[in-house]
Structures are given as C-alpha cells and as structure tokens.
Amino acid sequence: MDTPTPPHPTGSHTTRTPARPRLRRFVREFSYPHGIHPALLPGVSVEDRRVRYGVDRVILAVVGLLVVGFVVWGVLQPDAVLAVSSAALDWVMVHAGWLFVLLAIGMVVFLLVLAFSRYGEIPLGLDGEKPEYSTASWSAMLFAAGIGIGTIFFGPYEPLTYYLAPRPGAYEAGSEEAVTGALAQAALHWGVNAWAIYAIVGLSVGYVSYRRGRVPLMSSIIAPLFGDSPRSDSVGARLIDGLAIIATLFGTAASLGIGALQIGRGVEIVSGWSAPGNTVALGIIVVLTIGTIVSAVSGVARGIRWLSNINMLLALGLALFFFVVGPTAFLLNIVPGVLMDYVSSAPDALGASMAEGEDMQEFLSSWTIFYWAWWVSWAPFVGVFMAKISKGRTIRQYVLGALFIPAAVIVGAFTIIGGTTIWLQRTRGSVAPDGTAASLPAPAEIFWVVLDQLPGGGLVAPVVIVMLAVFFITTADSASIVNSQLSQRGDPAPRRMITVFWALCMAGIAVVMLLTGGDTALTGLQNLITITALPFTVVLVLMAVALQRELANDPFAIRDRYQRAAVEKATVRGLVEYGDDFAFTVERTPPGSWYAAGEGFDSTAAEITDWYRRTDEDGNPVDYDYVLGEYLDEGDGADGPAGAGPSGR
C-alpha cells in the first residue's frame, strides 16, 4: 500500500513505498546538495541566505575619489570639462552610437521572446510563492514609476521641438502630420524601448535574488558567465558594480539638474525675482540636497514615502488639469493618430543612422541616442525598484507589466501636456513667437509659458514647484540608497552616512553639469550622460546573456525538459511495443535505456547543482533541509515550508 510523503519543495505530492531501496536514497543524497534533485528545488531567496554584508572599501574609495575629483575639476574648470566631454561625445556617437540603438531594439525583442516562451512561467521567487502586492497595487507602483521630473520638463518642450524641427525626412514642420508625428517621436523615446532597458535589470535582479539566492548586485547577475561562484570582491565584480554606481550618479544627477532648472525658473516667475545665469538653480540644488540628507540621516523614510504618494496624486491632478482646462476635444481626437503613428513610424525612427548626414547626426546626438544613454544610466536604480515590487510574479507577468503599464502612463502624459503645447502654438503662436524652433524659450521655461496661458495656471504654479521639489528629494534619496547598497555588497539596510556621501556626490555632479553647460545647461547634461552610460551598455548585454543561460538550467526548465522527454519517449516506446493499446506509467529504467527521461542529461553537473549548496557567512558548507525550509546546524533560518518563503518584512 502506498503511503504519502510530505510535500516536496515544489508544492506537489509524491508517493513512495516503505520498501524504497536504501542504496537509491544514499546515492541521491551524495549526488545532490542537501539530497535534493535540481528539478525538485523550489528556488532560493537571498532573504533566506546567510550573507555577511559590509562596506566594500575598494569601490567606495575608488569610485568616490573619481567622482570627487571630477566635481572639483568641473567646479574649477567647467570650460575644460565641456571641451573634453564634447570631444568624447563626438567619438562615442560616431563609433558607438549604433550600440545604444541596438540595445534599445534588442531588449524589447529579448524580453518579449522570454515572456512568451516556456520560461515565461518561471516565477521571480520560490515555487508557489504569492506576489507581495496585489495586481492593482503592483500596477499602481509601476504607474507611479512613469511619472517624474522628466515628464514635466520634457513634456511640453520635446513634442513642440519635434513639431517645429522634426527628425530629418520624417514629416513637414508645422504640418497636420507633424502634430501626431511629434508626439509619436516623443512616445518612442519615453515608451516601451525605454522601459525595456529598465526591465532587463529588474528581471535579472529579481531572478538572481529571489530565485537563485544571490545578493542584488549587478556583478552577481553576470558572474555565472565567468564560471566561478559569484564573488563581490573580485576585480571584475568591483568594476561592474563601480560602473553601475557611476552610471546611476550621472543619470540621476541629470534629472536633479533639470529639476533644479525648472524649479528655479518657476520661483523666478512666481516671485518676480531673478538672478543671472543658473544661480537660482544652483542654490536650489544646495537647499534640496540638504533636504535629501535630512531624509537620509533622520530616518523619516516613511514620511518621504507618504509625501511621494501624495506627489503621485498631484502629478495625476496636473495632467487632469491640462486635460480639462486645455483643448480637451483636440487631445481626444489626436490619441488614435498618436498611437498609430507610434507603431507605424517606429521602424523608421529606430532605424535612423548616424551615416545619414549631418542633420541626422545632430538629431540623433541631441535626442534619440541621448535618451537611450540616459535610460541606461537610470537602469540600475529603476531596475532594483522594479525587482523589489515584483517578487512572486512570473516572468511573463513582469515583462508585460513592466513594458506596457509605465509606458502607457508616460505616453499619455506626453500626449496631454505636449498636445496642449502644440495646440497653443498652432492656434495662438504664443510659445515660439516666429514659428521656428530657434524662437523657443529656454527648455526650463516652456512649461511655465504654457501653464501661464491656461485658466488658473497662476494658482497651479506654486503646487508644481512643490511637486518638483518633492520629486527631487525622493529621487535623490532613492538613488543614493541604491548606490549605497551597491557599495556595501548588496546590504538591504545600508549605512546612512554612505548614503549621504553618494547624495552629495550626485548633487556635485548636477552642479558641474549646469556649470559646464552654461546658458545651454542641457549640453552639459547630454554630454556627460552619454559618455558615462557607454560602459554599462556592455554590462546590460552581458546581463541578458547570463539570464538566458541561467533560465535554461532553472528547476522549472529542468522539470519541463524531463516532462517533454518522458512523454515523447514513452509515446514512441508504447507505439513500438503495444501499438494503439498502451498507457503511461512511472517506473525505474535500467541504466543506459534510450527511453529514460533523463538520458543524456547530467543532473549532477556543477553548473546545475552548485548554486543551491548552502554556506554560512564565511562561505563554509552548512546543512539545510529544503523540505522543512531550515538550517540543520542551529535550527534557524527560514520559517515554514520552503514553498512559502520568508516574508522578509
């Protein structure tokens, strides 16, 4: 009579007979870590690992000195920084611009292929683990991720620029076609391709942390490509994590810089007081950085999160304000055209090349490739956030949500704000007085010019200033925490003073960006972002390769391999031996049988089994029971069955 066994880690039941041969059990226990077959493993969460976190003094010292040295150089010799960065940018655009374009296209294709392949059912967590957030809450958080400083700064400025000065060969400037064409071009830059760059980092971090049990470092994602166990203290690992920190610092500093420019212009308009150059913006960076530091050292994170949630509502309210008091019917009428243009013009826009003449080179350098580089620099920061909120989601759920929910939000925001701006230009000619891009106000001023022409705009302006200030603080605070984690071996609770250090570095870079750009501050932002993002572009490509390799040996994929082989071989054997009259049974096959489900597959190979072998904080082997979900040396570790997973809260 069969007796049931306890549930194995996959959450299903098996049956066994009391007479199971002891030799078979002995072989299994000594062939696999902790006596569990890799196909039966439920996954491993980093929250259930014994990890010794600590400050990586090498990364902190090397990256910190480089950044501080750059800030000092930029403050003392901003013209020299601009000259060097401009020359470097020219080289990057000519010799490596294609890499950014291929990345933006390739990541969309790669993620969609994963989502709709058999790997799409693999969870970013343990087998049977439920998502920490409901679908509605998760969608809302992705929704919120699409709103920020850039939406308000570029929302009116970018579409109007494309309307007056389109991509070479795309459409006639100022025409009917230019209305939807301009908004579609902006949607291309801020839409699915942008979020694919973020999503590859989020997917990789979520998979290696909550499915493979490794710390959430950029280096731990691609470590398997080099054949060794992940080591955060190796030269290669430190180089990768250092590049991630540098990219995040410069990418986020750019957002802080444009935020300060826009707040400064808003303060000047509301107060009637002005100062020469970027003096007000520089002062705002200082004041808001102090606010960020207070947030980091005082432990008021809960209050900041509450304020951030309020800010999301204010941002939605701002979009609703534009929609209601602006040209509502016009906006509704252009939505279908924008969507169709977005889809139909994407191949031409993505295929635009630096080899198509000087005008195209100028457009791509100033816009398309700059944006791909900016999103690369933001990828470590945004990706870590997306991974945290997506624990328990399947790869298919994650990819479809991460690509399309925030993209829909930001495209909608651009259509409303940018569409209103284009409508004002078409009906009143009041934004660019002579109808050319050359007559546009400064980028930081355009939003305020548009707002001033809407009923009630003067009342809304102070609210927008506060909203931008909160976006500044929450962005700087969150990015500093991520950089602090990267420089402390993935510590989920990094030291506050190191977080403060990275916040100061970020502010310093933002100051240098404004100083090097002078009156055209965006020039400094664009140069430095594109240059510093290039090395991390290579890291993103390696991430995709490493992820594909690990998914092929995931417990789910191994089970799927056995299932396919078992069914196919059993069917052939049944037809050969019994014709139409056969049924499937599970039985042990003699060694070397061609019809064995595992024939030709080495389930004891190191690349398949070593990753779930448990160790203590010093890397010494310890015993672990995957059925009970606990360490056996001291009886501590995860509580409850392995399939449930620790909450981590």
Segments predicted by a language model, with ranges:
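Membrane-interface loop-to-helix entry segments
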Residues: V62, M93-L99, L103-G106, I240-T248, ...
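Loop-to-transmembrane helix boundary motifs in multi-pass membrane proteins
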Residues: E29, V55-G64, L225-D241, P276-I293, ...
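Helix-loop-helix connectors at the membrane interface of multi-pass transporters/channels
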Residues: V44-R50, L217-S232, G259-L282, A315-L318, ...
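Helix-loop-helix module between adjacent transmembrane segments
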Residues: Y32, V51-A61, L66-V75, V108-V113, ...
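Transmembrane helix-loop junctions in multi-pass membrane proteins
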Residues: W73-S86, S117-E121, P156-Y157, T252-S271, ...
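Long, low-complexity, intrinsically disordered cytosolic termini of multi-pass membrane proteins
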Residues: M1-P42, R561-R649
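N-terminal alpha-helical transmembrane segments of multi-pass membrane transport
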Residues: D2-A178, L320, E550-L551, A605, ...
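Inter-helical loop and helix-membrane interface segments of multi-pass membrane transporters/permeases
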Residues: P42-R52, P78-V94, R118-S134, F154-L243, ...
